[in-house]
């Protein structure tokens, strides 16, 4: 699922782009109104990132419009099972010109526990979140762990930590960390095999 970059977009909102101009905004909900800004290399297309935190029947969605590189646009989607029946999901949608069409979230797949688990955590303002057992479902046989920082004037510097089950490990190293004028820093990216649950 070459999509680990997409998870990072939950917190780092990607870098700016090339000689074209794109809308730039962030908001809670399905859309946002912002301002147009010129992109700088190597970003060459306009895009939207849709992010969702789902827990049982409750979900919170955000939208982020920005300039993107075409490589990020190919990442598509990611679903991270962080445990306690909760998921972090991301969708990337790019276009040659505004407005970009929305890429909707399908319903979460109904799948059974598969006998594996991963450390689960979702932490903001900390890189050492309390871990709990995230029971993996369906094809989720890998564990991810991401720690990073985003530097903001308001509400201040944000440290984040994300752990959970995913279906596969994409190729990503710290050297690929996305930056936005040095405001984003990816400190840790780990992806390992999930742990088999002990038999009763």
Swiss-Prot record:
Glycans are attached at residue 176. Disulfide bonds join 22-46, 25-32, 39-67, 73-94, 95-100, 118-143, 136-165, 169-191. InterPro entries: CNF-like_PLA2_Inhibitor, LY6_UPA_recep-like, PLipase_A2-inh_b-type, PLipase_A2_inh_N, Snake_toxin-like_sf. Expressed by the liver. Gene3D superfamilies: CD59. Keywords: Disulfide bond, Glycoprotein, Phospholipase A2 inhibitor, Secreted, Signal. Residues 1-19 form the signal peptide. SUPFAM superfamilies: Snake toxin-like (SSF57302). Belongs to the CNF-like-inhibitor family. Inhibits the enzymatic activity of phospholipase A2 (PA2). This is Phospholipase A2 inhibitor LNF2. It comes from Lachesis muta muta. The lineage of its organism: Eukaryota, Metazoa, Chordata, Craniata, Vertebrata.
């Amino acid at each position: 699922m070459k999509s680990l970059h997409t998870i990072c977009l939950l917190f780092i909102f990607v870098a700016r782009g090339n000689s074209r101009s794109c809308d730039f905004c962030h908001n809670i909900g399905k859309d946002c109104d912002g301002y147009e800004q010129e992109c700088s290399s190597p970003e060459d297309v306009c895009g939207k990132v849709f992010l969702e935190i789902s827990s049982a029947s409750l979900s919170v969605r955000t939208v982020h419009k920005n300039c993107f590189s075409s490589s990020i646009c190919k990442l598509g989607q990611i679903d991270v099972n962080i445990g306690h029946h909760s998921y972090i999901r991301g969708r990337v949608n790019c276009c040659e010109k505004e407005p970009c069409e929305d890429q909707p979230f399908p319903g979460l797949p109904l799948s059974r526990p598969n006998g594996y688990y991963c450390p689960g955590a979702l932490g903001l303002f900390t890189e050492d979140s309390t871990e709990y057992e995230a029971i993996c479902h369906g094809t989720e046989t890998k564990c991810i762990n991401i720690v990073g920082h985003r530097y903001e004037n308001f509400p201040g510097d944000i440290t984040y930590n994300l752990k959970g089950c995913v279906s596969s490990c994409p190729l990503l190293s710290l050297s690929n960390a996305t930056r936005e004028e040095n405001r984003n820093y990816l400190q840790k990216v780990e992806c390992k095999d999930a742990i088999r649950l002990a038999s009763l």
